[in-house]
Swiss-Prot record:
Gene source species: Rickettsia canadensis (strain McKiel)
Annotated compartments: Cytoplasm
Lineage of the species this protein comes from: Bacteria, Pseudomonadati, Pseudomonadota, Alphaproteobacteria, Rickettsiales
Gene Ontology biological process terms from the UniProt entry: tRNA methylation; tRNA wobble uridine modification
Protein name: tRNA uridine 5-carboxymethylaminomethyl modification enzyme MnmG
Cofactors demanded by this protein: FAD
């Protein structure tokens, strides 16, 4: 009988990262998925990254994950979003060739050390004494294991809706999983339903692009992965169009036929990626909504119209498409649809992503209530690492709000749960200036090296980068001009007779890297990414210093423990509402208590005073 230490169920974005991470740690791992050609399948939009999401991809790459490297083998349209704003909100994004992405993922995983792939369906999980023992396949056979990672995406009791038509499926032409839903219910997990959707696919040969707006990508694609030197995939353009008043009229006239508005779907959809029906209803005063026409591949004429996800009947979709500029003669290749599926309240998992009820069972991805490839992949890599570390009896790998967006996401989910699909935003991260795309490896790769999840090749690249950063920083401290000379060449500085280094100049408002290169031509020889990193560090030095002080306070509060048996109703001077919230959330640390919505600074002070009085030996204060 085959036996593996870790078994991953599901080959989507969470599953492939979980399986690869476990395998990198030297643990025999099995990935079970339904179809061989669908590893890392892009079920919805053909793109990776975006605002906040791009930072997640960089963090996954920093831990030697797959997503960043694979998109660099398949990216056909790179664009840095929000680049005119501050660096904390820059969002690297790349349009993907679907076929190239799946091909690259398949080639990597089928040749991955310590990883085997089984094409089949898991119907049940064998559990004894609240601990996983084996997976049970649909033919009745069992595969024993120590740890199981569930990354089931939208397949748990998945149900597709197109108008009044219902199709049991986890994705188009792929059957849903009911056995695992029943397993989770039997064990006693809190299960609810969520909904997501996708737009119709359009034949690009039937689009009149002269009526649309060209959206070029960046002139020089910036790779996601530290392992990629140059993106050599051909680059193409995207296009933008918009809905019209006629589009809106058709949607309003047919709202009763939409699965979302007919009452057919009761599950909650993503707030920040609404269907076109939702947009028309919720933003009724808007006369138009933008639609991004995104090619699905270099040799594929299919177009993904980002912005018009819908569950209207197919005939209504055909009608509304023809009211959009450039799409008057467009042909729909596949109708859009909504899909609802089961998920588990993420407060049922710990920050390692292991479930609290069942030892050795981990959840990652949409099963935890998230939406998005990047969010799923971020959870997958953490679940894979922790499952493997547990097999090896090593301490868990914990990411926090202070060092990563992945940590922010896991913290949000495990403390507060979610009643709608959770999507990552920069606004969720209070330390976002410190958690940028350009420094993801500086934040996380050393942590990955320490636990053994980072390859030798990436370790060498990282160490070389760190060396070059310090070398460049020292150079920027030595290159200097007198203030009088700087004034003569047009730099606005006070003529105090001192010398100004490049790092000093970087701190001047509106002073750019391009200006620095003109003054000091030697800077042209420096790696542009390293120069930009040091520019950002210098430009925002005072803000980063303040943020580091906040991070230090956060880390201090994270180790200030709150006893499990605390009675908040015995704490004087806090309101009944706050007592009820604290009793409901049961925070384990002062830091977590502070993050609960509605908990005031005064209440936190009252808790600390109460604990110091009750535990005057200070035993509650630290984990040590």
């Amino acid at each position: 009988m085959l036996k593996y230490d870790v078994i991953v169920i599901g080959g989507g974005h969470a599953g492939v990262e979980a399986a690869a991470a476990s395998a990198r740690l030297g643990v025999p791992t099995l990935l079970i998925t339904l179809k061989p050609g669908n590893l890392g399948e892009m079920s919805c939009n053909p793109a990776i990254g975006g605002i906040a999401k791009g930072i997640l991809v960089k963090e996954i790459d920093a831990l030697d994950g797959l997503m960043g490297y694979v998109i660099d083998q398949a990216g056909i349209h790179y664009k840095m979003l929000n680049e005119t704003r501050g660096p904390a909100v820059w969002g690297p994004r790349a349009q993907a060739d679907r076929k190239l992405y799946k091909k690259a993922m398949y080639q990597i995983l089928t040749n991955y050390p310590n990883l085997n792939i089984l094409y089949g369906k898991v119907e049940d999980i064998e559990i004894k004494s609240s601990k996983v023992k084996a997976v049970v396949l649909n033919d009745g056979s069992k595969i024993p294991c120590q740890k199981i990672i569930l990354t089931t995406g939208s397949f748990l009791s998945g149900l597709i809706h197109i108008g009044s038509t219902k199709i049991p499926a986890g994705r188009v032409d792929e059957e849903a999983s009911y056995g695992l839903s029943n397993t989770l219910k039997r064990v006693g997990f809190k299960i609810a339903r969520l909904k997501t959707g996708t737009p119709p696919r359009i034949d690009g040969l039937t689009i009149d692009y002269s009526k649309t707006v060209l959206q070029p990508g960046d002139k020089t694609p910036r790779p996601f992965s530290a392992l990629t030197n140059i993106v050599d995939v051909p680059q193409i353009n995207c296009f933008i169009t918009k809905t019209t008043s006629e589009t809106h009229d058709i949607i309003r006239e047919n709202l009763d036929k939409s699965a979302m508005y007919s009452g057919q779907i009761e599950a909650i959809g993503p707030r920040y990626c609404p269907s076109i029906e939702d947009k028309i209803v919720r933003f009724s005063t808007k006369s138009e909504h933008r639609i991004f026409l995104e090619p699905e591949g270099l040799d594929d004429y299919t177009i993904y119209p980002n912005g018009i996800s819908t569950s209207l009947p197919e005939e209504v979709q055909c009608k509304l498409i023809k009211t959009i500029p450039g799409l008057e003669k467009a042909t729909i290749l596949r109708p859009g649809y909504a899909i609802e599926y089961d998920y588990v309240d993420p407060r049922e998992i710990s920050i390692t992503l292991e479930t609290k009820k069942i030892m050795g069972l981990y959840f990652a991805g949409q099963i935890n209530g998230t939406t998005g490839y990047e969010e799923a992949a971020g959870q997958g890599i953490v679940a894979g690492i922790n499952a493997a570390l547990a097999v090896k009896n090593q301490p868990p790998f914990i990411l926090t709000r202070a060092n990563s967006y992945i940590g922010v996401m896991i913290d949000d989910l495990t403390i507060f749960g979610t009643k709608e699909p959770y999507r990552m935003f920069t606004s969720r991260a209070e330390y976002r200036l410190s958690l940028r795309a350009d420094n993801a490896d500086l934040r996380l790769t050393e942590l990955g090296i320490n636990i053994g999840v980072v390859s030798k090749k990436r370790k060498e690249i990282f160490k070389k980068k760190c060396y070059n950063i310090e070398k460049t920083r020292n150079l920027l401290k030595t290159l200097s001009f007198t203030t009088s000379k700087l004034v003569k060449i047009g730099v606005q500085v006070a003529q105090d007779g001192t010398y100004k280094t490049v790092l000093d100049l970087f701190k001047i408002p509106n002073f750019t890297i391009e200006q620095a290169i003109k003054i000091f031509p030697k800077l042209q020889e420096i790696n542009s990414n390293i120069l930009q990193l040091l520019y950002i560090e210098a430009k925002y030095a005072s803000y980063l210093a303040k943020q580091q002080a906040d991070i230090n306070l956060f880390q201090n509060e994270e180790i200030q423990l709150i006893p499990k048996n605390i009675d908040y109703f015995k704490i004087p001077s806090i309101s009944l509402e706050i007592r009820e919230k604290l009793s409901y959330y049961k925070p384990t640390t002062i830091g977590i208590a502070r993050r609960i919505p509605g908990i005031t600074p005064a209440a936190i002070t009252a808790i600390i005073i109460y604990l110091k009085t009750k535990y005057n030996d200070g035993s509650f204060i630290s984990n040590n």
